[in-house]
Amino acid sequence: TALIFLFMSVFVPNITGPAQMPEVEMGEYARYVDPFIGTGGLPWVSGMLFPGATAPFGLVRLSPDTAFPAGLNPFKMGTAGYYYGHNTIWGFSHTRLSGTGAVDMGHFRVTPVTGKMSAADRLSSSLPFSHDKETATAGYYAVYLPSISCLAELTATQHVGVHRYSFDTSKDARILIDATSFLAGGRAEEGRVKVNPETYEVEGEARVFTGFTGRYGGLKGYFVAKFDTPFKSFATWEGSAVTEGKIEAFGNDTGADLNFGNLKGKSVELKVGISFVSLENARENLEFETEGKNFDTVRDEAVAEWNAGLSKIKIDTNDKDIKKIFYTALYHSMIMPTNFTDVNGQYLGFNEKVGVAEGYTYRTDLSLWDTVRTTHPLYTLIEKEIQLDSVKSLIAMAEESGALPRWPSGAGESGSMFGTPADLLIAETYLKGLTDFDAEKAYNFMKNTALETDDDSPAAKRDYNKEYLQYGYIPAQAGKRSVSYALEYAWEDYSIALLAEALGKFEDAEFFKERSKSYKNIFNPETKYFQAKSKNGTFVEPFSPYITTYYDEVLPIKVSSAYVEGSPRQWRWSVQHDPQGLIELFGDRDYFISELEQFMKDATPKRAAIDPGSGYWHGNQHDLHAVYLFIDAGRPDLAQKWIRWVLTDRYGTGADGLDGNDDGGTLSAWYVLSAVGIYPMAGTDKYYIGAPIVDSAELDLGNGNILKVRAVNQSKDNIYVSEVTFNGEKLTEPYITHALLDAGGELVFTMSPTPAENGGF
């Protein structure tokens, strides 16, 4: 679907309606951001992104909650609350995840309405809208709601959502604040709302149970909302009972209805401070971040903050689509992990313990199984503080719960996905010289979990680990997903070995490095695939490499119980830590190359297909690195060819511009890194040298150094690399270390329309 607003000019276009949208200066980088990218596409394989307002890595993600008429939102169409194919808005809630397959949160929905309403009206207050009167960019969102003649505008700080509603009707203008709102499929408890008409304020709280938060007892939040306009009258509701003038209400369905009277030609602004610690903290967050500021001031500050973040990578290209895709991808990579620390340093930790973050910002919503592959490696270059915050937060979570979490969401462990991906994140951070954390403590948590065999232990984060340690693989009899689990454990063991070595624990390093070779135990030399294996050492039959599996999705396609979210073909390449060992298993390097190229050719012809097939699937994580394996096989030219194909074919400028769920910026960061010509070997301190799609780039490394990338003769046809130099010296192999890049310098690619001998190396 083509977007109406493309944001190629300096100003956001005006929306006609009750009040003209102010001309908003977007600045040099935010003007290229299009938050609608990844909000549409086919159900379930959408990017699952939202177009609303947020600050970089902020707590508040203020965005419309949409649906079809009658509130229909089937098939996980909009897990972040918004789906581009919907045509009604139910209101604007303040919390959500970004790009995940899980519907989560949706705290404190605000909905503008007009005229008189019954309780039944409140439950069906959907507002039609069209995309030709909707616009968004980094830090700002607006939509015209014709049924109530209202222009809704949103912006945000780290902990505060700021709204402005401009009405062009003589009907009473009203604002509903639902204290117990949640996104689709959730529920709420412990709701409370209180109105203070003297100070134009509403406060409240609720515990929300949704996709992830419902797995650990719900996430209780608090809000203080302050208006700039007095109420003409007000009511509160408890379920279907609406009581005029009642100041306080309680229950699992409660909120406030605020009547401002005739606001024709006028606007009402409100600021909503959020905290997950206390009501007092919500108020302190509100006052600290927005005291004395109106909507325009907050919006301008949000846009400026985004421009500062986006300017950390300056690119040059004459292709406007590339610039749009690049800066939107960089924007989407800077939404999670979430700032969970209030302005006074307090945060709600695991088991609802209130902690204090000293010397760092406690962050949550870490989609580690995904983000360790691309997003966090990007942070080690341009967002070092965010990377260290993430590590320190994981250690704090482990201290509270007994183990490093797998997928922390809000104030608890969601348990989503599998393995111990925090091992990769922590090891890579330390190996790249970011050592300002308690590495010994982190290592002990990593080691304990890797050796834990008691399923009842808090450290039991590896399913079937007892069998893994006993057999050197996970027998099929132990349970489902045995192949995928074993491959991930081997990768994670290798990262533990690298950290052990860096810490001088050489016996441990040798042990885990040897165990990281366990992937070989499930490789069938006859079929040349990783397969489920029985306790007696025989491979399970029948076997087909083309069957695709989904266990945690609502639309199962096929069942092949040894694999997670993919086919045996897609898991065939999952030996990120030992690509040469993988190639040796194939027995012949040329055979490996031909199989890998056929795998790429068998990708679905269309981006974001509902059935990804068994070939290359850029919309999921386990084969994201596959195109770079051509480099390990001695064919950098094929890597260069297929990198350009992924960059141009699997990304676009429309609402369907991603090949699947973005998962906390994972697909977005893949684009950012590959577009400038490098790709991380996750869990290590090394990068592949790829082939850039931009003419040049400057990366601000945050340590006083600048990494410059230049692509000489860059064009749509010149996709191959004939030579690469770093600081004037020709590179003789297509790899580079983090230490070299992080010291700054210039990486120069000479591009060519034809493959070079040895891929330019």
Model-identified regions with their sequence ranges:
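Signal peptide processing junction and immediate N-terminal pro/mature segment
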Residues: 14-20
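Accessory carbohydrate-recognition regions in carbohydrate-active enzymes
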Residues: 21-424, 430-487, 495, 500-521, ...
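Beta-strand-rich recognition domains
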Residues: 707-713
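Short coil-to-beta strand junction motifs in C2/discoidin
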Residues: 692-694, 716-721
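ATP-dependent phospho-/nucleotidyl transfer catalytic cores
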Residues: 492
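Bacterial N-terminal signal peptides
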Residues: 2-13
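Short polar/acidic secondary-structure junctions
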Residues: 157, 714-716
